[in-house]
């Protein structure tokens, strides 16, 4: 088991480092703790980061810019310092991607094996990226789709190539966790990518194209791959009312799990056929399918006076 976090002197205190530990799991407790990666950290923000295992069991993690400005942030000067990158830590390898401002989400497509991430912009340009090997996400020069002028401003980190996001929000939503469904329990959504956000408490669903390297939109407002400030997002909003979502995970049981930081709760999304009629005695709340008033299947449940709705 791998554990990646920013270790500090105390809760909210000075960071000591972004650290990766491995443990053995015997089914009851974690044992044999080993520090395998100790990354530089002096700031309390933009440290990272998600961790993911690909189809070959390689392990990756993402690190934010940590307030640094150097070559890995697309400046012409400054020594690389393991910030604004996706690292492969097992087996060790040079930077998989650079130019990342701040990310809370990594996911591997279970069909294609391709890596995807979410990235938070400053006050614009939140995005979803298809992260190919030697990817340059563009920060601090580019956030959101690039203009020709911005492309010319990239100094160019040898061997790394910039690609536009697969989707961008003009207004910040703080996208976080993302996950694919590969389960017969959600057959309708096998070709979908689910993304959560922290600012609005929304769960988004993006329909993948046949090549699984981009999205299909029916709305003319979203077909330019940008959600402008006044564009309707009804097509992609799958669920609402989750507070600050920090992670979206497809579990080994084939169900979808939503982690809400603000609610202190893990929500499990289940199809009606496996639904339960009451909440289990834990922080996990199970959503039950019910027929909507207009004949559309939806999930509706209430927790802490906030209504949650999911379109199915």
Predicted regions and their residues:
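C-terminal membrane-anchoring or membrane-association module
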Residues: 296-312
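Structural WD40 beta-propeller signal
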Residues: 52-56, 109-111, 181-183, 251-253
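Juxtamembrane/start-of-transmembrane alpha-helix segments at the extracytoplasmic/lumenal side
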Residues: 275-290
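Asp-box/WD-like beta-propeller blade repeats and closely related beta-sheet repeat scaffolds
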Residues: 14-53
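Short, exposed beta-strand-loop hairpins at the edges of beta-sheets
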Residues: 12-13, 256-260
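Beta-propeller domain segments
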Residues: 65-236, 243, 261, 265-272
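Conserved positions at the start
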Residues: 46-48, 56, 100-105, 175, ...
